[in-house]
């Protein structure tokens, strides 16, 4: 699939390091929560970004591509391919979302969709500090929300993983998690210890080049699962036997410790 041109209609400053880019395209992207698009920043790179709304991406400035994206203004354009990937599957009628930082991008629309179809939603959201809190209104509109900040400037002091102690993990029909991989791995280990890893879904980030399962750059050990096509959402049991939390591969294919 060749990229289509998408004009940036609006830019929302969510936090000092996170922006939402609303895109104007000829047709709605119609992605399901958890799917992603390949975003081409002309002259820089093409990178995967999760849909945070039907026609929007929410991005944290972390590297060359996102830094270039942050320099664009309303009226500028980017290239878009997709949506790709499997996305979340809503299971049962009482779900838990566990969000770390900009892991909110795929989880907030999941909570909204679940709420619309009558599913009870509880969210545990972790941020570094008060000024990094975002999508709070979306989470609260979906259901119950508990917030933690690393420095205690908002909500409970501590990491989002600390909040797991405050809920009965076994009461939920499905648990969904997205955030930094170290945080997700700690969550996965906690779910495994509680005996509910098989009732969980995680959105994994890897180096993705083609987006259609051909190049193999995003394959995970040991099963060879392609994050771009088989994921980015995987169940907890699958991830327990994978490389998650241990290492990932860079653009050259070399292992990099998480």
Swiss-Prot record:
PROSITE patterns reported in the protein's UniProt record: 2FE2S_FER_1, FAD_FR
GO biological process: 'de novo' UMP biosynthetic process
One Pfam family of this chain: DHODB_Fe-S_bind
Cited SUPFAM superfamilies: Ferredoxin reductase-like, C-terminal NADP-linked domain, Riboflavin synthase domain-like
Pathway field: Pyrimidine metabolism; UMP biosynthesis via de novo pathway; orotate from (S)-dihydroorotate (NAD(+) route): step 1/1
Binding note for cofactor: Binds 1 [2Fe-2S] cluster per subunit. Binds 1 FAD per subunit.
UniProt xrefs under CDD domains: DHOD_e_trans_like2
UniProt GO molecular function: 2 iron, 2 sulfur cluster binding; electron transfer activity; flavin adenine dinucleotide binding; metal ion binding; oxidoreductase activity
InterPro entries: Cyt_c3_hydrogenase_gsu, Dihydroorotate_DH_ele_sf, Dihydroorotate_DH_Fe-S-bd, Dihydroorotate_DHASE_ETsu, FAD-bd_FR_type, FNR_nucleotide-bd, OxRdtase_FAD/NAD-bd, PyrK_electron_transfer
Keyword tags: 2Fe-2S, Electron transport, FAD, Flavoprotein, Iron, Iron-sulfur, Metal-binding, Pyrimidine biosynthesis, Transport
Cofactor(s) needed by this chain: [2Fe-2S] cluster; FAD
Domain FAD-binding FR-type stretches: 1-90
UniProt binding sites for [2Fe-2S] cluster: 210, 215, 218, 228
Function, in words: Responsible for channeling the electrons from the oxidation of dihydroorotate from the FMN redox center in the PyrD type B subunit to the ultimate electron acceptor NAD(+).
Assembly notes: Heterotetramer of 2 PyrK and 2 PyrD type B subunits.
Family, similarity comment: Belongs to the PyrK family.
Cross-referenced PANTHER family: DIHYDROOROTATE DEHYDROGENASE B (NAD(+)), ELECTRON TRANSFER SUBUNIT (PTHR43513), DIHYDROOROTATE DEHYDROGENASE B (NAD(+)), ELECTRON TRANSFER SUBUNIT-RELATED (PTHR43513:SF3)
Protein name: Probable dihydroorotate dehydrogenase B (NAD(+)), electron transfer subunit
Native source organism of the sequence: Methanocella arvoryzae (strain DSM 22066 / NBRC 105507 / MRE50)
Upper lineage: Archaea, Methanobacteriati, Methanobacteriota, Stenosarchaea group, Methanomicrobia
């Amino acid at each position: 699939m060749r990229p289509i041109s998408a004009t940036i209609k609006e830019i929302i400053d969510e936090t000092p390091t996170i922006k939402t880019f609303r895109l104007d395209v000829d047709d709605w992207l119609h992605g399901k929560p958890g799917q992603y698009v390949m975003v081409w920043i002309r002259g820089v790179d093409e990178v995967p970004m999760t849909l945070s709304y039907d026609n929007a991406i929410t991005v944290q400035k972390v590297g060359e591509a996102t830094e270039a994206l942050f320099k664009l203004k309303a009226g500028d354009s980017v290239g878009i391919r997709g949506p790709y990937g499997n996305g979340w599957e809503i299971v049962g009628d009482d779900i838990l979302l566990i969000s770390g930082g900009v892991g909110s991008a795929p989880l907030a629309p999941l909570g909204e969709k679940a709420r619309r179809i009558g599913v009870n939603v509880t969210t545990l959201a972790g941020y570094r500090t008060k000024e990094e809190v975002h999508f709070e209104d979306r989470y609260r509109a979906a259901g119950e929300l508990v917030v933690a900040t690393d420095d205690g400037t908002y909500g409970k002091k501590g990491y989002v993983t600390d909040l797991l102690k405050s809920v009965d993990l076994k009461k939920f029909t499905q648990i969904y998690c997205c955030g930094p991989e170290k945080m997700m791995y700690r969550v996965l280990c906690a779910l495994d210890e509680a005996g509910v890893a098989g009732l969980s879904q995680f959105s994994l980030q890897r180096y993705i080049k083609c987006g259609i399962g051909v190049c193999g750059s995003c394959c995970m050990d040991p099963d060879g699962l392609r994050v771009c096509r088989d994921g980015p959402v995987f169940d907890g049991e699958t991830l327990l036997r994978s490389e998650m939390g241990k290492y990932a591969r860079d653009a050259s294919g070399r292992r990099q410790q998480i």
